[in-house]
Amino acid sequence: HFTLKEIYEQPDVILKAGQTTVDGIEDAADLIKNAKNIYITGSGTSYNSALIAKQILSKYVKIKAEPIIASELQFAPETIEENSVLIAISQSGESADVLEAVRITKKLNCKIISIVNLLTSSLTRKGDIVLGMNCGPEIGVAATKSFTAQLILLYKIVQKLGENITIGFEEFSNSISKMLENTNKIQEIAKELKEVSDIYILGRGINYPIAIESALKLKELTYIHAEGIPGGELKHGPLALMDTDVFVIIINPNDSTYADTLTSAREIKARGAKIIGVSDIESDVYDYWIEIPKISEILYPISEIIPIQLLAYYSALEKDTDPDYPRNLAKSVTVK
């Protein structure tokens, strides 16, 4: 399948991105540094990249940015201030909602930074600065390697804006390759998900957008109802859904959110739900543990999503659905 091939291409995407100088990164960093306001837009997976961009910009370089879903921006153009910067993210560069968001913001004298894979696209032409994902064609409808490529570009912008932010792309690429060498455990977990109706994915901080992206991958590839929830919101409603019929994926790397997220996992387990832990630390609370590499905190999102992409892929095979071309979906949504 194309989807599996594209998942396995991600170490190369990381390595290539680390080794090449991307045209426009410096210009993009300058534009962001001097911007009155920064907005980030995208649809689907690209919007989930925007959520991570917001967090890394504020955490590492103290720059505030506002993510807006592309399809929502057109109904609230008054939220956009004139002379701002819009970072528009789209793999195809032809997403109708993203192009409409760009059209609206351009009218307000906003500068556009286009993050795009297809360099012959409409979004490329509309960008004041264009950052190419450079990850090669992505055939599978569900975004995999393009998500990683988007995040790498956003990391490089943050690196350019900040001092002393070192990202070891080569080392990171190697650790992802190693993780991809042994997927037996993920394939076993996929068998367990075959008859499941509901999966919840829990994360805090920078891991929460990964919970949302994980839910999207599971929906797209397996047709299982999946929902990403912020860990701290568990007692504000989602805990009522926890029982012996559900699986919960806990995104829990060894960062500042670790202890609180583990506490949430224990509360969920006490209600009888099965727990899949995605972490670099094993815990007795997990019924199944997917080990991720120990790496710097900024890189956790990529190392967390890749095993979930695989889990969604293998679950699709178990359920006999087509992982490359999910029903009712198109690779590029060119109509509203």
Q: What are these language model-derived features?
A:
Residues 56-64, 222, 284, 299-336:
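In a subset of proteins, long, contiguous C-terminal domains/tails are tracked
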Residues 2-39, 129-247, 257, 319-336:
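Active-site phosphate/pyrophosphate-binding segments
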Residues 7, 251, 301:
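Active-site-adjacent beta-strand anchor residues
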Residues 3, 44-53, 208-220, 305, ...:
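Conserved phosphate/anionic-ligand binding catalytic regions in large, soluble enzymes, centered on
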